[in-house]
Amino acid sequence: SGDGTKAKYEPSIKKHFQTVLDMVTLDGYWMEMGVRGGRSVEWLLEKYPNKEYHGFDSWEGLPEDWFIGASVRYKAGDMNVDMPNFPNNIKLYKGWFTESLPKWKSDHKGPIAFIHIDSDLYSSCKTTLEELNDQIVPGTVLAFDEFINFRLTKKLGNWYEHEWKALMEWLQTHNRKIKPLTRNYAYQASCVVIE
């Protein structure tokens, strides 16, 4: 639970993302779920060129159809791109989250400081939160890319069926609490875990 009216407003997607990065205070892993072409990884590197960052993606496109509202519909396989190249401090993990996250967890213990969830789908967000639940601790910052339709457009009219829904279920299932941190003009928002 949390009061979204108290979130810091940042107008642009890039400025919003970089503002969220500056709010991370916890020591722990920094992660991105849904790297795709790596735009937000590049934004991270602008601010923190030496930060170790763990990025996950199938690089095969969406694992299932995604209906986000109005006539905007993506099919399984849409959004596939080649895996980008980054400096060695950016660790990339190829595969579906259901396979790559358990493998990653077996070698990476301890708290997660930051997760950028840009995996679009309810199922992908749910997998992320459930798989990483024991490493998401008070102080972990969660940033979402398609979270709420702040613009009230038809393009993301189905927002409540995806990242929002997965987060609400995770909060209830695990008796967690969050505090809003930021939002932008479109769909992005972030929060910090407090319980």
Task: Cite the ranges covered by each PLM segment.
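Pre-Walker A adenine-sensing motif
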Residues: Q18-V20
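S-adenosylmethionine/decaboxylated-SAM
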Residues: D22-E195
